[in-house]
Curated annotation (Swiss-Prot):
Family to which this protein belongs: Belongs to the universal ribosomal protein uL2 family.
Residue span of region Disordered: 38-59, 223-275
Species lineage: Bacteria, Pseudomonadati, Pseudomonadota, Betaproteobacteria, Burkholderiales
Protein name as it appears in the record: Large ribosomal subunit protein uL2
Keywords attached to this entry: Ribonucleoprotein, Ribosomal protein, RNA-binding, rRNA-binding
Sequence ranges of Basic and acidic residues compositional bias: 229-244
HAMAP family associated with the record: Ribosomal_uL2_B
An example Gene Ontology molecular-function term: transferase activity
Pfam families, sorted: Ribosomal_L2, Ribosomal_L2_C
């Protein structure tokens, strides 16, 4: 992969920086692993907006990615690496020895033709998946399960990874990129290495239209609205916020904790570092 600065042939392309990946497959994705993807445009079942700035965008198919990696002991060959419009990471198409094909999150350094395997006896090599109890302490991992057998939920985006810090009884401690240290059951699975496409965060979109292609709509400031639309709205002429920054629904926007899942608080050993 390489970062390419585009020629400033227009105002929209001036400053644009692309991530070019010549190893990615240029043809169509594997049809058997595609599903229809419907857009909610940020609305709930009542049609009310629950997530702002969503809507439009290019039509996409959902690529069914194997987050469980439960075909133990069966080697799989990497057929190709592909772009996935539904996530920041790239995906890899695996062909197992029994003929089945599955998509996985492509780890950093994975090459076409490499052989991957999952299970308790899998070697400690990038792309292989094992239960955490079989992974050496200090290993860099990604695609980590939070509940055994449920499938990977943590460290799945481009460039993401975690470090296995310790094992104590039936739980292990994992340090995430945010600085948070979590307890994870040792039967949970994780994949060796870190997620690829690590240069994704260095790209520059360049123009508003490129965000519209991705289904992201404009963000309007609260102070530019009417009082009925936002707590910061209204006033004669240009005015400040006149109160602490809040969301359109009155929730404080800075420093206010919104985590409600107290049931899993005991799984967090150390909170993430504040920016």
């Amino acid at each position: 992969m390489a970062l390419v600065k585009v020629k400033p042939t227009s105002a929209g392309r001036r400053g644009m920086v692309k991530v070019v990946s010549p190893k990615l497959h240029k043809g169509a994705p594997h049809a058997a692993l595609l599903e229809k993807k419907t857009r909610g445009s940020g609305r709930n079942n009542n049609g009310h907006i629950t997530v702002r700035h969503r809507g439009g965008g290019h039509k996409q198919h959902y690529r069914v990615v194997d987050f469980r990696r439960n075909k133990d002991g069966i080697p799989a060959k990497v057929e190709r690496l592909e772009y996935d419009p539904n996530r920041t990471a790239h995906i890899a198409l695996l062909c197992y020895a029994d003929g089945e094909r599955r998509y996985i999150i492509a780890p950093r350094g994975l090459e076409v033709g490499a052989t991957l395997i999952s299970g308790i006896e899998a070697p400690i090599r990038a792309g292989n998946t094992l239960p955490i109890r079989n992974i050496p302490v200090g290993t860099t991992i990604h695609c980590i399960e939070m509940i055994p057998g449920k499938g990977a939920q943590m460290a799945r985006s481009a460039g993401a990874s975690a470090v296995l810090m310790a094992r104590e009884g039936t739980y292990a401690q994992v340090r995430l990129r945010s600085g948070e240290v979590r307890r994870v059951h040792i039967q949970c699975r994780a994949t060796i290495g870190e997620v690829g496409n690590e240069e994704h965060s260095l790209r520059q979109i360049g123009k508003a239209g490129a965000m519209r292609w991705r289904g992201v709509r404009p963000t309007v400031r609260g102070v530019a609205m009417n009082p009925i639309d936002h707590p910061h709205g209204g006033g004669e002429g240009r005015t400040g916020e006149a109160r602490e920054p809040v969301s359109p629904w009155g929730t404080p926007a800075k420093g206010f904790k919104t985590r409600r899942n107290k049931r899993t608080n005991n799984m967090i050993v150390q909170r993430r570092k504040r920016k």
